Amino acid sequence: MFEKPVVKTFQYGNHTVTLETGVIARQATAAVMVTMDDTAVFVSVVGKKEAVEGQDFFPLTVNYQERTYAAGKIPGGFFKREGRPSEGETLTARLIDRPIRPLFPDAFKNEVQVIATVVSVNPDVQPDIPTMIGTSAALAISGIPFNGPIGAARVGHIDGQLVLNPSNTELEASKLDLVVAGTESAVLMVESEADNLTEEEMLSAVVFGHDQQQAVIKAINEFKAEVATPAWDWVAPAENTALVTKIAELAEAKLVEAYQITEKMARYDRIHEIAGEVNEVLLAEDPEANTKEIHTIFHDLEKTVVRRSIIAGNPRIDGREKDMVRALDVRTGVLPRTHGSSLFTRGETQALVTATLGTQRDAQIIDELTGERKDHFLLHYNFPPYCVGETGFVGSPKRREIGHGKLAKRGIAAVMPSVDEFPYTVRVVSEITESNGSSSMASVCGTSLALMDAGVPIKSSVAGIAMGLVKEGDDFVVLSDILGDEDHLGDMDFKVAGTNTGITALQMDIKIEGITKEIMQIALNQAQGARKHILSVMDEAISGAREDISEFAPRIHTMKISAEKIKDVIGKGGAVIRALTEETGTTIEIEDDGTIKIAATEGAAAKEAIRRIEEITAEVEVGRIYTGKVARLADFGAFVTVLPGKDGLVHISQIAEKRVEKVSDYLTEGQEVQVKVLEIDRQGRVRLSMKEAVEKPAEEANDASEAKGE
C-alpha cells in the first residue's frame, strides 16, 4: 500500500535529526515528519496550482499548533480540546514565516499553506528549531518555486562559550537565547534575547549559528535529491514594459518631488493624488486597463525613486542624514492614577505606556507542553487603527501585536528585578498613538520610563532603535531610526534594544541575499550610537527608579511564620484567611516555606493583618498574663481563649481566692478576663488561673519587699 518512505538522518550538534516523508498525509503537496531527540513535528505544505486572477499579494499562511498529547497530557478547560493558538504558538508561527517568505519569487501569487503540528515533545528540546527545519524540508521537496532550503539554529552563551541548540536546562544559565535562520549563503532572520552582550558577541553568535546550520541545509538538499519531486511548471508573468515606461513618464518626476515632503500624512495625500492622476490618464486611454497592475507598477516605481535617492546620498524622506535620529520628546507621570506612565515620542512615532503593579497572585499562569510556569512580567502592545490615520477593526490582538509585544518584552527582561528583589507582578501596556516606523522600539523606551516612574528597580534604562538598509549592487546605505516607508521599501529591518553597556534584544529580517558580516557590523555600531543618544535624552527625564511606588499601588509587606503554622492561618476550608482578607481589605499570599506577603493600599490595613497573623501564630507562654475571652462554661471550670484558636482551662479552683460553688456565679460566656498561664502539658493542653493573674494587695506586696530586704 505504501511506497518505501524516504528517510534522512543526520547529526546536528549534540542532537540526531531525522527527516521522513512518503507515509503520512500523501494528499498534501508535501509532508515531512521531523524528529530531534524525541521531539517530533509533522509539517505539511499545500500549494494551489493557480493563483486567483488579479491577486496582487502572496497569500502565504503558516499555522503552528502544539497538541497536548505530545507531552502525554489532556487539555484543561470545559471542552477538553485545544482551542485558539496560544501566544507561544503565534510567536513560533511568525518565527517560521519570516525566513521563508522572502524566498518565494516576487511574482508568485499562488496560495501556500504550511501547517506544523507538534506530535511528540522532549522537555529538553524546544519544538521551534525542528519545526523550522521540517518546514524548510517540506517546501524543498514540494516542487513549489522556493529559493531555499533554509537552516535554523538556536545559539546560547554559557560561561563565555557559544553553544549550539542548548537544552532548556542549559538556557537557564545562558546569557543569550538567539535563533538564526538563513540559506547557504545568507542570514535571513535573527530573533534574540540577551543579558547585556556586546555588539561583537552578538555578531559572533549570529555568524556561529549560520555556520553551524550548514549541516541542516546540506542534509535537506540530499533529502530533496532523493525524493526527486518534479518542479512546478511555473514561469513568472512577463513584465508589461510598455505600461512600466508609461507610468514612469507620468509619475516619476512627481514622485521625486512628493518624497521631499517631510510630513507623513501630507506626503501620503500627495502620492495618493499622483496615483489618481495616473489612473485617470491610463483609464482614459484604455477603459479596460488593469487597475491592480497599474497599482503594482506604481508602487514599484515609488520604491525605485526612494532607493535611488538614498543610494545617491541625498537626504532621506524626512530630510535627515543616514545616521540621524528623529526629534525626541520624553515625558513621565502623564496619567494621574496609574502606578507609572510615560509618553515617548520620536518623530511621528509615539507610545503611551503604563505600568501596573500587582501581587504574585496576578502572575500569568502559562501552561506549556513542557510544563506549567508563572510569568510575573507582562508586556502588551496595542496598535489601534487611528495611530496611522485609518479606520479599522478593534478586537483581540493580531499576530503582529503579539510579536511586537514579545520583542519589547525581550528588550526589557534583562534589567527587570527578580521576584525576590521586587515581589510584584508587573504589567506594562504600550498604546501606540502615532506610528511612522519602529513602534516596537518606542515601546521599549516607553516601558523603561514607565517602570522607573512606577518605582520598579530596573537595573538600568533601556532604549531601542530600528535600523534599515538599502543595497544596490555593491553600494549600500545603513539607515538609523527608519520610517515606515524606509522599512517597507528597504532591504532590512534590524531592531536593537539595549542599555549603555550592551544589547538586550536583537531582531533582524533581511529581504535579500548578500548581507555580509561587515554590513551587519556597521549596522550594529551605528545602532549603538543611536541607542546611546536616545538613552541620554531619556535619562534627562528620569535616570533611575523613583524611591517610592505610587500611592495607588499595593504595598507588599513580607513576614515569616513557621511552616507548621500555615494551616492555622489558612483555617478549615480557608475560613481564617478569607476572614482576614475581607475584614482587613488586604490580599494575603502564603508560600510553602511560611513566607507571607500582605498587599494593601493603606498601611493601617497591612498592620492590622500582620497583627492578627502574629496573634494566630503566636505560642502560648507559661507564666505570661493574657486578656482572654470566656469561650465556654463547664461544671469544673471555664475555657478561655487566650490567642486566636488557642483555648485553656481555668479550673473552678483557680477562678477566685475563695471557694467557688458555681462557675456561672462568677463568669459568663464572652466575658473578658485576665488569666495567667500555669502550665502546658505534653498533649498541648493549657492550664490557666484567674486568681494568679490578680495583683496582690499592697500589704502583701510590702511584706514581700521587706522579706527581700528592700
Swiss-Prot record:
The keyword Transport does not apply. Component of the RNA degradosome, which is a multiprotein complex involved in RNA processing and mRNA degradation. It catalyses: RNA(n+1) + phosphate = RNA(n) + a ribonucleoside 5'-diphosphate. GO terms for cellular component: cytosol. PROSITE patterns: KH_TYPE_1, S1. Residues 554-613 form the KH domain. Belongs to the polyribonucleotide nucleotidyltransferase family. This is Polyribonucleotide nucleotidyltransferase. One of its GO terms (molecular function) is magnesium ion binding. Its EC number is 2.7.7.8. Residues 623-691 form the S1 motif domain. It is an enzyme of class 2 (transferase). Its cofactor is Mg(2+). Mg(2+) binds at residues 487, 493. It is found in: Cytoplasm. It comes from the Bacteria. It holds the Pfam family PNPase. Involved in mRNA degradation. Catalyzes the phosphorolysis of single-stranded polyribonucleotides processively in the 3'- to 5'-direction. One of its GO terms (biological process) is mRNA catabolic process. The gene is pnp. Keywords: Cytoplasm, Magnesium, Metal-binding, Nucleotidyltransferase, RNA-binding, Transferase. Residues 691-710 are annotated as: Disordered.
